[in-house]
């Protein structure tokens, strides 16, 4: 996919850009990530530096340089935010009315292409029913703001020094996010992955 990206063509208009990305273009990001994963496993990279430079040149100049200007222009279209569910509505659409126990796993910088790979792996498990959906993240795409957007809220604000407040509660750490969540769902908890990983199985 990265080599064929040398002839990459990006459509015009936000709906068509989204459709092409979900159908095909995510594979470019996926292969780019896989390439660097394998490259970083090498003890001696000298023999592969020209290949790395080629991959980087194609990815940056033939793919991103064509995609990003049209993506940014698409976001300026009057109805662009109606083309996808938005991250800021995540709780209202997915959690508020859930009847069963729900676990939300948050991973920093988990792009659609990673989700697509996880979806494929889960779909291969006969005990699992997997579904993949897309959402448009908050802008700016800032980790603390993104995590806050997943919480129940009436308003989210960011201070001049980039502190994120959810309904006037500071949410710059796990305790702050749990405080907000428990105001809406008292029987809920926020935990770090490492704390769960360290638990012993009973």
State where each predicted segment sits:
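…; additionally, a secondary subgroup of soluble metalloenzymes is captured
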Residues: 1-102, 109-202
């Amino acid at each position: 996919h990265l080599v064929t990206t040398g002839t990459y063509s990006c459509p015009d208009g936000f709906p068509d850009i989204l459709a092409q990305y979900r159908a095909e273009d995510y594979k470019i990001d996926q292969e780019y990530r896989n390439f660097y994963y394998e490259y970083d496993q090498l003890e001696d990279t000298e023999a592969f530096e020209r290949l790395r430079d080629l991959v980087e040149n194609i990815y940056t100049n033939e793919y991103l340089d064509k995609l990003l200007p049209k993506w940014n222009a698409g976001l300026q279209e009057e109805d662009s935010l109606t083309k996808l569910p938005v991250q800021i509505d995540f709780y209202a659409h997915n959690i508020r009315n859930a009847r069963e126990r729900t676990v939300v796993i948050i991973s920093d910088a988990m792009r659609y292409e990673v989700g697509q790979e996880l979806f494929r792996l889960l779909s291969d498990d006969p005990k699992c029913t997997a579904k993949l959906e897309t959402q448009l993240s908050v802008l700016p795409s800032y980790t603390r703001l993104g995590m806050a957007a997943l919480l129940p809220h009436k308003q989210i604000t960011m201070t001049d020094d980039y502190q994120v407040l959810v309904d006037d509660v500071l949410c710059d750490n796990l305790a702050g996010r749990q405080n907000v969540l428990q105001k809406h769902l008292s029987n809920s908890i926020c935990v770090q992955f490492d704390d769960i990983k360290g638990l012993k199985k009973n």
